From Swiss-Prot:
This is Maturase K. It comes from the Eukaryota. Keywords: Chloroplast, mRNA processing, Plastid, RNA-binding, tRNA processing. GO terms for cellular component: chloroplast. Signal peptide: none annotated. It comes from Grahamia bracteata. GO terms for biological process: mRNA processing; RNA splicing; tRNA processing.
Length: 510
């Protein structure tokens, strides 16, 4: 972000959140499409796959002149000959929407940079906290002492205007809001990315950056209010009773906010819900988890509070079936490709005292995580590595590659899956996945050389594709000391890597 801060006049545009003039700045397109500025994408002599800043300006003007703006993308037939290029509307409409997404992301990045620079002497570097695997050590530390959990499917806006209204609180530029409406209403199936993974619209495919920004901003808006409640309730619990005037003043400010939150008449009731007891909240994508040490009655209050909160403040209708109340000791959490649960492990210890012996039974709670094998095998089958029953098959589309490239591709997939699912308490599932990939690789190579798998493996020997099974030992040898008993043997416990920032494609079946 530093390399283009000098191009942007913060005092004029960004202080007032005026974004529309930046759409006509050529350097913005350069940063959005070519961060290294090695080549220019905006060329005046634009062809079918080239872009011209002048044409972009004309397109925006043409959009506003249309009585029915849906005519631009009404169909993708051969009749679409705007400016003499087939699908040119689609092309320029796409680039404007992507650059618009790049522009609205800049203020958040600048705020993050300024915040880190102002506190860099006080804040310890915590890049590992950005890893999605950091959630599971949190589970292991906190969930052993909790009773109930709410599994929440975050509702999505039923109308596009809700997203626009949310942005109005910080985007004061009316022209940008109008342009955003053009983008949103153009893609009528915009919410298929949330409601269905099978049918992905043009919007989610070609304008995923803009869509994800809008959806994340929508979720962040409601989470910011949620975190505000939690922080204030925590502050009240830690404040001594003697500071009565400060508490009265604080409650006065809370009552003032009743106008902002019209779904309740008594703000103290909301605060009580957060104080007794304090909940733990995590989220990834469209699913969140709220865990508490409270009773079943309290969790039901949480459930209907969230439903009313979404409906009254964000105009979102959420059915009660989208929030599940489960007891941690009897239920497994389905989260980020893992089944997580709290298990009770019993151990019997024999104690000898003089002539008497006693058997002491100890029960300890353990946070257990296992891999969701059926969806993972389904993902492998969808990628044509095996059939629906898990039997390995050859990857026919890779038979034209070199042998080394085929082995590297299979090995990369295997390493990524092993890396992501290394936190599993049971390793047998990973062995099965490795077996599928190993045999699929052998079948692919045998098909390429027009040989049988048995003859191919016999010719290469037992060392063929040994990296499929030795990758974890290689990683552990770098992490653990050489003289460690764990390093000398094969460690079967969970390992969470804090360098994973997203779910691998084959691991993402949600």
């Amino acid at each position: 972000m530093k390399e283009f801060q000098r191009y942007i006049e913060l005092d004029r545009s960004w202080q007032h959140n005026f974004f529309y003039p930046l759409i006509f700045q050529e350097y913005i397109y350069g940063f959005a499409y070519d961060p290294d500025l090695k080549k220019s994408i905006l060329l005046e002599n634009a062809g079918d796959k080239k872009y011209s800043l002048l044409i972009v300006k004309r397109l925006i003007t043409r959009m506003y002149q249309q009585q029915n703006h849906l005519i631009l993308f009404a169909n993708h037939s051969n009749q679409n000959d705007f400016w003499g290029h087939k699908h040119t509307n689609n092309l320029y409409y796409q680039i404007i929407s992507e650059v618009f997404a790049f522009i609205v992301e800049i203020p958040f990045s600048l705020l993050l940079i300024s915040s880190l620079e102002s506190k860099k002497r006080k804040i310890v570097k915590s890049h590992n906290l950005r890893s999605i695997h950091s959630i599971f050590p949190f589970f292991e530390d906190k969930f052993l002492h909790l009773n109930y959990v709410l599994e929440i499917l975050i509702p999505y806006p039923i109308h596009l205007e809700i997203l626009v209204q949310t942005l109005r609180y910080w985007m004061k530029d009316a022209s940008s809001l109008h342009l955003l409406r053009f983008f949103l209403y153009e893609y009528r199936n915009w919410n298929s990315l949330i409601t269905s993974q099978k049918s992905i619209s043009i919007f989610s495919k070609r304008n995923k950056r803009l869509f994800l920004f809008l959806y994340n901003f929508h979720v962040c808006e409601y989470e910011s209010i949620f975190v505000f409640f939690c922080n204030q309730s925590s502050h009240l619990r830690s404040t001594s009773f003697g500071v009565l005037l400060e508490r009265i003043y604080f409650y006065g400010k809370l009552e003032y906010l009743v106008k902002v939150f019209p779904f309740t008449k008594d703000f103290r009731l909301i605060l009580w819900l957060f104080k007794e007891p304090f909940p733990h909240y995590v989220r990834y994508r469209g699913k969140s988890i709220l865990a508490s040490k409270g009773t079943s009655l309290l969790m039901h209050k949480w459930k209907y509070y969230l439903i009313n909160f979404w409906q009254c403040y964000f105009s979102l209708w959420s059915q009660p079936t989208r929030i599940y109340i489960n007891q941690l000791s009897k239920h497994s959490l389905d989260f980020m490709g893992f089944f997580s649960s709290v298990q009770l492990n019993s151990s019997v210890v024999r104690s000898q005292m003089v002539e008497n012996s006693f058997l002491i039974e100890n029960t300890m709670k353990k946070f257990d995580t296992i891999v969701r094998i059926i969806p993972l095998v389904g993902s492998l089958a969808k990628a044509n590595f095996c059939n629906v029953l898990g039997h390995p098959i050859s990857k026919s589309v890779w038979t034209d590659l070199l042998d080394s490239d085929i082995i590297d591709r299979f090995g990369c997939i295997c390493r990524n899956l092993s890396h992501y699912y290394s936190g599993s308490s049971r390793k047998k599932t990973l062995y099965r996945i490795k077996y599928i990939l190993r045999l699929s690789c052998a079948r692919t190579l045998a098909r390429k050389h027009k040989s049988t798998v048995r003859a191919f493996l016999k010719r290469l020997g037992s060392e063929f594709l040994e990296e499929f099974f030795t990758e974890e030992e290689k990683v552990l040898s770098l992490i653990l000391p050489r003289d460690s008993s764990i390093a000398r043997g094969f460690y079967r416990g969970p390992i969470w890597y804090l360098d994973i920032i997203c779910i691998h494609d084959l691991a993402n079946d949600e």
